Amino acid sequence: MKQSNKNVKDKNITKVAFSHVGCEKNLVDTEHMQGLLDKEGYEVGNNLEDAKVVVVNTCSFIETAREESIRKILEFTDQGKQVIVAGCMAQHFKEELLKEIPEIKALVGTGDYQKIAKVMNRVEKGEIVNEVSKVPEFIADEKIPRLIDQKKFVAYLRIAEGCDYNCAFCIIPKLRGPQRSRTIESIILEATNLANQGIQEIILISQITTNYGQDIYGKPSLARLLKELSKVSVPWIRIHYAYPTGLTDEVIKAFKDSNNIVPYFDLPLQHSHSDVLKSMNRPWQASLNESILSKIRDQIPSAVLRTSLIVGFPGEEQKHFLHLLDFLHKHKFDHVGVFIFSPEEGTSAFDLPNRVPSEIADARKDNIMSIQQNISKKKNQLYVGTKVKVLVEKISKNNELIGRSYHFAPEIDGNVILSIKKNVIENNYVGKFVEANICFADEYDLYGEVINIL
């Protein structure tokens, strides 16, 4: 992590802004591109109006993400900006995009963002650039410059890129390439650098975090990595995208034994019924769901469980959906995200028969969310009358502190909203941990009062 180059004085220097669409893995790519351009002397900022060049880092996971990406591209080309399209849409449509939107100046693939400065130089010379590798192979390490918003106290740390699985609904392996892990040494160096810069929470990400190390160490090595990360002086380390098969006894023990790895388990299970999971090309999962969830709850009573689900997958019958509802009632996840199946060309699910009508899929999603809201509200209410540790991230217009306890991941979960008994300057609390007494809870957020700064 580094701060922007403050020594750039040349008023003729090219101003570059970024527009980001998609997941946190895409965000890390954006931060690396910003760092690389900053290192080369470009004026990198957030002011899209003043920028001569706009890099749109796109998402192509589902149709709605592509639509949002295209809207942004056209918005900036219509404004006369020089637009560089990076990320998953560039990878996905490397032949079509430049033909369909000739105003685009360059494409940069998911395995080519390290070349952004060279691409920029060519664009400034008037070239139309297509810098998209057929198969992405690159993964950035701690040596690649990276700009992280200095107003934030949370950073994502990518431990691996790509995926070797072939889930029927997912196009990510085609967009991100095969799995390639960073070494433990490289990850520890970056984590230490982040901690030294004042980052309070590091979130480990990859496509399948529990598969970390399989490609370079010959076996999944997340437990070994967590043991080393527990020595880094950062208060919270959170793990996203853990799969059931990788949650071994050794991994769970690493969670238990660490003081800074929060007991938050993000498990994208997708479904509960064996028939649907088999159609999703995840046949191994159904037999593990129950045992893994029970094991986590038994061994770590304070564990927070999040999952993501897909409804409306081809062939999902009412009996399959009712099985999923029973599964949710039984296991009472703290947080649930629900997605309606999106048929993606290039995936095996695209040609599956027996598609579920959209109105049924919509109703199933609404049904799950209604059930989950009641579950989440009851679980949140258990915190009323207790004291929790909260990372304060901002102050509202009403002079309330807004932050998170370890029970909430940024962006996808709720917040802890705290009142204070006196007016304060932002720097008194923001970026710090406080102890808070929880007085009220709804289905999304916790509310309380600050007791003291930790």
Swiss-Prot record:
Binding site for [4Fe-4S] cluster 1: 23, 59, 88
Primary localization: cytoplasm
Catalytic reaction list: L-aspartate(89)-[ribosomal protein uS12]-hydrogen + (sulfur carrier)-SH + AH2 + 2 S-adenosyl-L-methionine = 3-methylsulfanyl-L-aspartate(89)-[ribosomal protein uS12]-hydrogen + (sulfur carrier)-H + 5'-deoxyadenosine + L-methionine + A + S-adenosyl-L-homocysteine + 2 H(+)
Cited InterPro entries: Elp3/MiaA/NifB-like_rSAM, Methylthiotransferase, Methylthiotransferase_CS, Methylthiotransferase_N, Methylthiotransferase_N_sf, NA-bd_OB-fold, Ribosomal_uS12_MeSTrfase_RimO, rSAM
GO cellular component: cytosol
Keyword Ligase annotated: no
Cofactor binding summary note: Binds 2 [4Fe-4S] clusters. One cluster is coordinated with 3 cysteines and an exchangeable S-adenosyl-L-methionine.
Cofactor: [4Fe-4S] cluster
Record: residues binding [4Fe-4S] cluster 2: 163, 167, 170
E.C. numbers: 2.8.4.4
Domain MTTase N-terminal span(s) in chain numbering: 14-125
Cell location: Cytoplasm
Residue intervals of the Radical SAM core domain: 149-378
GO terms of molecular function: 4 iron, 4 sulfur cluster binding; aspartic acid methylthiotransferase activity; metal ion binding; protein methylthiotransferase activity
Record SUPFAM superfamilies: Radical SAM enzymes
Keywords: 4Fe-4S, Cytoplasm, Iron, Iron-sulfur, Metal-binding, S-adenosyl-L-methionine, Transferase
Gene Ontology annotations of biological process type: tRNA modification
Chain ranges of the TRAM domain: 381-452
Keyword Lipoprotein included in the entry's annotation: no
Family stated for the protein in its record: Belongs to the methylthiotransferase family. RimO subfamily.
Role according to the record: Catalyzes the methylthiolation of an aspartic acid residue of ribosomal protein uS12.
Protein name, per record: Ribosomal protein uS12 methylthiotransferase RimO
Organism in which the protein naturally occurs: Prochlorococcus marinus (strain MIT 9515)
Record gene name: rimO
